[in-house]
């Protein structure tokens, strides 16, 4: 039986016809990003708005995870999270972040670095209102980066919240919102 190392070494892709042509690139990085993101969306890439974002913990260890990019505000990338999550705590301690979008379907990736800061509440409120009701309830129910005893605990919390907010607009929780990456 072939081991995983042998299998990995045999993986090959040809990129000759996918080369970047400098004349086709936009000198504005945000416009270039928007162009490639549009290309990824057009070919129905899997999760084209998923970005890996890296922070640094209190011991200066890098930590990466995927988040969903949701908007561009004044040339800043926007994502949303629980303000008590490990990523939020790390950003509050050291706002320098880096990340990458990878779209294998179009043979493109974009790497970025920047300073993360909490978005204006208007940005967070607008996005929260656009979320499906289930996503709004999940924001209230989930305490990111905290271990739970089982999925049934989370599901029970969502049922409680469904009753609490039945027939009402769900407000954005104060502990949840957006970050801008400049």
What are these regions (language model features)?
Residues 1-182:
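Binding-site signature for planar aromatic cofactors or substrates
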């Amino acid at each position: 039986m072939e081991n995983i190392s042998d299998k990995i070494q045999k993986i090959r892709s040809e990129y000759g016809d996918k080369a970047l042509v400098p004349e086709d690139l936009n000198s504005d990085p945000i416009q270039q990003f928007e162009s490639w993101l549009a290309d990824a969306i057009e070919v129905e890439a899997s999760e084209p708005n998923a970005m890996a974002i890296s922070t640094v913990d209190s011991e200066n260890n890098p930590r990466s995870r995927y988040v969903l990019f949701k908007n561009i505000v004044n040339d800043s990338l926007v994502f949303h999270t629980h303000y008590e999550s490990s990523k939020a705590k790390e950003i509050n301690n050291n706002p320098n972040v880096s990340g990458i979008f990878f779209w294998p379907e179009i043979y493109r990736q974009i790497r970025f670095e920047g300073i993360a800061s909490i978005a204006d509440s208007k940005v967070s409120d607008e996005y929260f209102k656009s979320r499906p009701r289930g996503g709004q309830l999940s924001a209230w129910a989930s305490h990111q980066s905290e271990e739970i005893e089982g999925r049934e605990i989370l599901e029970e919390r969502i049922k409680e919240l469904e009753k609490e907010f039945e027939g009402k607009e769900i407000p954005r929780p104060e502990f949840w919102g957006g970050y801008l990456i400049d």
